[in-house]
């Protein structure tokens, strides 16, 4: 029936987390087809779009304007515009803007499609060597309010846990994890995934603390912690 031929209007398009070769053919084609591209930071996305010869109207869509922008974007979608959302790196709406827009579009009965593609936590989990049959993704922990509550709630977690962390907080986070999970808990930290200086450090939380106290702390970090055995 014709009902099933609804053209998908909102696409969530993953972008490389460091290596441009990780862009999929389909991602490039969708970005060339849509009418509007929403980017987390237009300056970050410009080189990527230029590299793949994508010349489209690009608007900023980030955590500071997404609440306001959603209704306007929904209006464009209802007019039949095709829109793609990209984040600075990886899959939109995973620890990045996008969730509010997806929810609003679905509420309005619009079609939403997320393309498979780059995301930082999957390679970090797989190459950590920690059990990955069951895991929980925690993203960024709250910076202040609710941080200790969240950590206490995870103290009994049996699944492998995955966190995102920024370089300036990584040592403090390792110390907090030692307090909650103990010195001997197995863990793995991946940084600069898919880039030239990719590094995966595995061992106990104590091993990781020693390593990062004595080595430069740069790049994007994914922190995997083994569950309670």
Role assignments for model-derived ranges:
Residues 9-10, 80-84, 160:
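Loop/turn-to-beta-strand initiation segments
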């Amino acid at each position: 029936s014709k009902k099933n031929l609804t053209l998908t209007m909102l696409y969530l398009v993953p972008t490389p987390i460091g290596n441009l070769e990780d862009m999929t053919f389909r991602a490039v084609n969708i970005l060339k087809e849509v009418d509007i591209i929403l980017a987390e930071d237009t300056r970050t996305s410009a080189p990527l779009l230029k590299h793949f010869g994508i010349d489209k109207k690009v608007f900023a869509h980030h955590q500071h304007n997404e609440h306001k922008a959603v209704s306007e974007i929904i209006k464009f979608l209802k007019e039949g515009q095709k829109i793609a959302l990209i984040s600075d790196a990886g899959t939109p709406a995973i620890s990045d803007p996008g969730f509010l827009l997806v929810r609003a579009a679905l509420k309005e009965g619009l079609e939403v499609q997320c393309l498979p593609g780059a995301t930082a936590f999957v390679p970090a989990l797989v190459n950590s060597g920690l059990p990955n049959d069951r895991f929980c993704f925690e993203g960024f922990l709250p910076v202040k309010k609710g941080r200790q509550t969240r950590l206490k709630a995870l103290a009994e977690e049996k699944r492998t846990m995955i966190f995102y962390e920024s370089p300036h907080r990584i040592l403090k986070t390792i110390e907090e994890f030692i307090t909650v999970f103990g010195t001997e808990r197995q863990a793995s930290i991946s940084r600069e995934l898919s880039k030239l200086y990719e590094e995966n450090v595995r061992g106990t939380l104590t091993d990781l603390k020693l390593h990062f106290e004595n080595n430069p702390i740069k790049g994007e970090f994914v922190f995997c912690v083994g569950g309670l055995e």
